[in-house]
Amino acid sequence: MLHIKDLIWTLYFIGAAVALEVNIVPDQGEISLGESKFFLCQVSGEATDISWYSPTGEKLLNQQQISVVKNDEYTSTLTIYNVSSQDAGIYKCVASSETEGESEGTVNLKIYQKLTFKYAPTPQEFTEGEDAVIICDVSSSIPSIITWRHKGKDVIFKKDVRFVVLANNYLQIRGIKKTDEGNYRCEGRILARGEINYKDIQVIVNVPPLIQARQIRVNATANMDESVVLSCDADGFPDPEISWLKKGEPIEDGEEKISFNEDKSEMTIYRVEKEDEAEYSCIANNQAGEAEAIVLLKVYAKPKMTYVENKTTVELDEITLTCEASGDPIPSITWRTAHRNISSEEKTLDGHIVVKDHIRMSALTLKDIQYTDAGEYFCVASNPIGVDMQAMYFEVQYAPKIRGPVVVYTWEGNPVNITCDVLAHPSAAVSWFRDGQLLPSSNFSNIKIYNGPTFSSLEVNPDSENDFGNYNCSAVNSIGHESSEFILVQADTPSSPAIRKVEPYSSTVMIVFDEPDATGGVPILKYKAEWRVVGQEKWHARYYDAKEVSAESIITVTGLKPETSYMVKLSAVNGKGLGDSTPSQDFTTQPVKGEPSAPKLVGHLSEDGNSIKVDIIKQDDGGSPIRHYLVNYRALNAVDWKPEMRVPSNSHHVTLKTLEWNVDYEVIVVAENQQGKSKQARLSFRTTAKPTATTATSASTGLGTGAIVGILIVTFVLLLVVVDVTCFFLNKCGLLMCIAVNFCGKAGPGAKGKDIEEGKAAFSKDESKEPIVEVRTEEERTPNHDGSNQIEPNETTPLTEPEHPADSTATVEDMLPSVTTVTTNSDTITETFATAQNSPTSETTTLTSSTAPPPSTAPDSNTVQSVQATPSKAEVPTASSPPPTSSPKVAPLVDLSDTPTNNPSKAVANQAGALNPSAATSAAEPPTAIIKPVTTVPANTTSPPPTPEPKQVKQEQSGTKSPEKESAQPSTVKSPTEATKDESASLSNTKPLQGEDFQIDGGTFKTPEIDLAKDVFAALGTATPAAVASGKASELVSSTADTTVPPDSAKTEKTQVEENSKPEETDVKSTPAEVKTVPNEATQRNVNESKA
């Protein structure tokens, strides 16, 4: 217990003794310049004051840089901001107490400099090849150790002598390369403090530019709208910039003629001209330096005339023509005229022309100039690039020069021109004189003067000897004058030619002669050859053109008889007349030798160059006429001959076309007659070279051949369509009508009149080319009239049907029952009468109608004489009897108003076949038949134009026969069955005529192509068909026995036939024809007996 008390008291006394103890935390301090640091002062015991004192002993107060803060009664804090070297030293913390006194504590503040890089810029750039020094300045309070590292390694260990660390710790790289480029680390170390710091420095190695021209020399041609590209290739680091200079002057981007690519390595010059020729520099520049390359642009130029001059001088003077030209290479200059070239070294012997050449210039000197030197001179400059030519005009003024024939021939009464051709510049005034008297004058009324630009003609019409003689032509201009005498001489007929040789053949003679010695002053126009048979007085003559025979001086007389003696003589003909004849020479033609002589060939190449006209001149025919010529030809380089051609003997030439260009050809012609062939006549020629195609200089709107042919075809097709449509609507015929009937079910053209028409006529052809008349009376009944369906006729409907045995009655009833068949002085025309309106005919009846004019012996125009018919042919009056001059005044049954009206036919009188007048009063009114005249062509007429109908009926062509001969011929009769079996009438012949209108009681309807024969008109008293065929109108003739027929009787027949076709007017010659079959023998026999 005692011990515890002692311990407590001991501790108490110890604590009282150390109550003002001062402790500074941290007890020491080191700080780098610029850094901040604080110290904490702790006091043990109760202190009334705690203060801080600087190393200099000054009490520190609370300041901006040094802060003193008393935290509580026991602690105080000293803070030093941004220390500097002056702040180093011992700082003291003092604690004081009133009872205890003072107590202090100290701390030593050490200040040092931290390792820093004072100057180490990055990047650092160097030029390749130089000694580079990499700068790195290090700052520290105590020395530091500096090392350099590159790519993670110390450069010292590279063992590269180029790397050296200098004394100032800089790194030197000798001859730095582009491969040395990169990051270098500068590292500092302080061993005492273990401090380390580093700095990475980027090293850039710049490479100087290198530049090279792709082409050192570039060639171009000026004025050819060319473009040229100049280019350079540059290299370096960094990439160099390129610029261009021309003759040391910068070329700016944006000039009109120049453009650059993106990096300016290429420069394009447009529309190169000679002025663009120069040295161009391309310069590459970067931080390492610059480089330059030279490009030479050589511009060649076509020659161009720079100077020419037109000149004028006087005859006999001297002048020099100068021509200058530019171009590269230097052009050579030559001279030429329109007719020849003048060389640069040319110098005539007399010194008339001298040519001297200089660089880019040439001079042409003309001495003693003549008027013929005037004209156009061409200066031609040429070099390898091209040629330029320019004309200059050289004008020579000279005195008049008179040209023309001095002697002129004519004769009295023949006007002649004396022409004075005047050459002068300037133009001259021309005057005419006769015996010193100016013409024209009142004393010379037969003289006229005609003036032209370069001539003056004096027309003299001599009427006496005084008009012949001298005439003077005088011409004057500003340079001088000249006159000339012209002599007008009276011409004479030529002298006789001289026969040198006479070479006879079988039918020709060849006369070789010499031209007359004297032409009489005027040209020989013709030669006259005269010949006669020896012993006869009559001379035969023929004229030959002097131009044709003068070339070879040979005349060939043709048309002679073989083995005959002849006399021949020649004479010449000029403008005045026929000259003297040569003495007659005898010769004898040779016997017939058979084959002809080879013809003579003359070729005329055509303008197109690849065709030729070969004239074939007939020679001796060998005594028999030449039948034809055999023509063969081929190209000489070809083996085969072209197909042989036969040319008629009356042809005088043959044309060979579409030959090859620029090829040699040979032609062989052989004449052939009945006796054989002649020898070969040969002709060789060469075609011209194929012309080059030229392009039209102006726009042409002409059409090609194909377009023209196409237009013509389309026009023709459209025309056919228009005609076909017109025929369809007007005449109910044509292709459209055929399609409508056969495919569309349209009624045929005869459907309109089937209920109105009471008789139809169809016109067909048989082998005898005679028309067949079918007549159906309204009393007849056919299978189509029994109320059943009627069959419309069409193009395929047969014309005839097999004859029904039960039908034995005559199918034709005349208006006068006593007569059914009438025979007249006419041709026989066979027509078929349909027994049903719209069905094929079942029987045929042959009637005879007149195609000849009626005889002139008719007693009256309205009288019909009754003639008894006999079984034999009726007596035929003369066919040449003229028609009567008067016409009956009766109403016409047939309207032929569309036919030609000239020479209208009169009423038929004195008909050979007449109606029986006694039957007219007793017979009932006959059924009305619808009749249409057939448009026929007489056998003896000229070729008529084709009719509009598609089916043309052919008329039998027969020669003119006398009535006497025709009456002696027996009648030809065919049975009805034979007529039925006759198949010569083809389907085309049985087609109905369309478009023909009938008027019945004012109604109009169409009928097929069916016509009644002319003899039906004769039977009914109308005009003969011959009158219709010749364009003459027909009129109805009364069928009664009275000599006069009242008009009312004719008017009872209301049927009027309108004929649409207009037969061409022709001269008809009657040809008696044969009578053909009648339907049954009983009717035929009765008719014949009545005629008898």
Curated annotation (Swiss-Prot):
Residues 20-705 are extracellular. Residues 1-19 form the signal peptide. SMART domains: FN3, IG, IGc2. Residues 493-592, 595-691 form the Fibronectin type-III domain. This is Neural cell adhesion molecule 1-B. It is found in: Cell membrane. Residues 820-832, 839-851, 917-929 have a biased composition (Low complexity). It comes from the Eukaryota. Polysialylated by ST8SIA2 and ST8SIA4. Polysialylation modulates cell interactions by confering both attractive and repulsive properties that are highly regulated by ST8SIA2 and ST8SIA4. Polysialylation is formed on a-2,3-linked sialic acid of core glycans. Gene3D superfamilies: Immunoglobulins (2.60.40.10). Disulfide bonds join 41-93, 136-186, 232-282, 323-379, 420-473. Glycans are attached at residues 82, 219, 310, 341, 417, 443, 472. One of its GO terms (cellular component) is axon. Residues 754-1005, 1024-1092 are annotated as: Disordered. Keywords: Cell adhesion, Cell membrane, Disulfide bond, Glycoprotein, Immunoglobulin domain, Membrane, Repeat, Signal, Transmembrane, Transmembrane helix. Residues 754-784, 1050-1068 have a biased composition (Basic and acidic residues). It comes from Xenopus laevis. The chain crosses the membrane at residues 706-723. Residues 860-871, 968-978, 1080-1092 have a biased composition (Polar residues). Pfam families: fn3, I-set, Ig_3. This protein is a cell adhesion molecule involved in neuron-neuron adhesion, neurite fasciculation, outgrowth of neurites, etc. Residues 724-1092 are cytoplasmic. GO terms for molecular function: axon guidance receptor activity. GO terms for biological process: homophilic cell adhesion via plasma membrane adhesion molecules; synapse organization. Heparin binds at residues 149-153, 158-162. It is a single-pass type I membrane protein. Residues 20-108, 113-202, 208-295, 303-397, 400-489 form the Ig-like C2-type domain.
